[in-house]
Amino acid sequence: MENLEHRVAESRTEQIQIVMPGYTNGNGRLFGGKLVAWMDVVAAVTARRHAHRDVTTVSIDNLQFKKAAYANDTVLLIGQITHVGVTSMEVRVEAFVERLDGSKELVNRAYFTLVALDSHERPTP
C-alpha cells in the first residue's frame, strides 16, 4: 500500500494559465469550455503519471463553476488522484484564480474518471 500512496503523491499535477482576451466572452469572462479543456489535460497528465500508461477520459462528474475568471487572470489548476480502481482512476481537478498578492480563490472543481489503456487502446490494469 505504501507504494501506491507514494505513486499517488507523485502524480500530483499543477498547470498555470493566463486568461488571454481571445479565451473570453463578450463580458471578459473565461469561456467555460476553455477551462474544462485545461482541466481535462491536467487530469490526463495526473492519471498518466500514476498509471505509467496512456489514458482516456471516460466521464466528468460534479463540474462546478463557482466563480468567474477574467481576462488577464492567472489560473492555477491542480490535479490529484482521489481513487484508483482496477483499470480506472478518479482525478480531482481544482482551478483557482491566483491574485497578484499570492492569494487564491477557487473558481472550479470537477472529478474526472480516466481509464488506463494498453497498446491496443483497451482498458488495462
Regions from the PLM with identified roles:
Residues 2-59, 115-125:
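Hot-dog-fold acyl-thioester-processing enzymes
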Residues 3-15, 70-71, 82-125:
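HotDog/MaoC-like acyl-thioester-processing domains
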Residues 18-19, 29, 39, 75, ...:
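Hydrophobic aliphatic residue packing
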Residues 42-98:
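A contiguous binding-surface segment within folded domains or other stable secondary-structure elements
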